[in-house]
Design a protein with these regions (language model features):
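Thiol-/selenol-based redox modules, centered on thioredoxin-like
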Residues: 166-211
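Structural microenvironment flanking redox-active thiols in thiol-disulfide oxidoreductases
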Residues: 92-152
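Bacterial signal peptide processing site
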Residues: 35-37
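Short active-site neighborhood of thiol/selenol oxidoreductases, capturing the structured segment around
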Residues: 71-91
Length: 211
């Protein structure tokens, strides 16, 4: 598997997925206030409030800046682990994140997507810059040494493994998304199968205080 072809050729596919997400979102706007009267609307993800994991993260973004969860206080963080050469699960997750931001409208400014690579060997900062930019200018790709990635994965109970292929290797990995509230606390885990509406629903709840 040639890493260079993921730096150029798939960009059209990434852009196509992002554009499709934006169009879908425009056609089905998210009404964030539809459940404001409820004390605690039923969450679409798994409530993990108070979990003894997912409390720390320290990696480097695609611009070379060290990032921790403290940097995003005041925002809800969508945290996802994946890799650039992922054929469909990762680009689908990122395209869905674009839809989520569209549904949230002005509140999207208080949401940050963090994409942690589980393939630091191939996912260089330059490649992460291209990959993130293909979806949304605010998305941040995080990388580090193999040891740092392993530490982050353990902290969030993420599984990943290198799987040999005939021409190189691919990565097997968990596909859930973690929602971290504006105080930097892990609150919700959303499965990959959930829709953009499900994600927007739970994020909107966290933006309203999550209580």
């Amino acid at each position: 598997m040639n890493p260079e072809r993921f730096a150029v050729a798939p960009r059209r596919r990434w852009l196509g997925l992002a554009a499709a997400a934006a169009l879908a979102a425009a056609a089905t706007p998210w009404l964030a206030g539809c459940e404001r009267g409820a004390d605690r609307p039923a969450l679409r993800g798994i409530d993990v409030t108070g979990a003894p994991y997912g409390r720390a993260l320290s990696l480097t973004d695609q611009y070379g800046q060290r990032r921790t969860l403290q940097d995003f206080r005041g925002k809800v963080v969508m945290l996802y682990f994946g890799f650039v050469q992922c054929p469909d699960v990762c680009p689908t997750a990122l395209a869905r994140a674009v839809e989520v931001l569209q549904r949230l409208g002005p509140d999207a400014e208080r949401v940050q997507l963090l994409f942690v690579t589980v393939d630091p060997e191939r996912d260089t900062p330059a490649l992460l810059r291209d990959y993130m930019a293909a979806f949304h200018p605010s998305f941040l790709g995080l990388t580090g040494t193999p040891e740092e990635i392993a530490t982050a994965a353990r902290e969030f109970k993420v599984y990943y493994a290198k799987v040999p292929t005939g021409s190189g290797y691919t990565m097997d990995h968990s596909a859930q998304t973690y929602l971290i509230d504006a105080q930097g606390r892990l609150r919700i885990v959303l499965k990959h199968e959930r829709t953009a509406d499900d994600y927007a629903h739970d994020i909107a709840w966290l933006l309203r205080g999550g209580a």
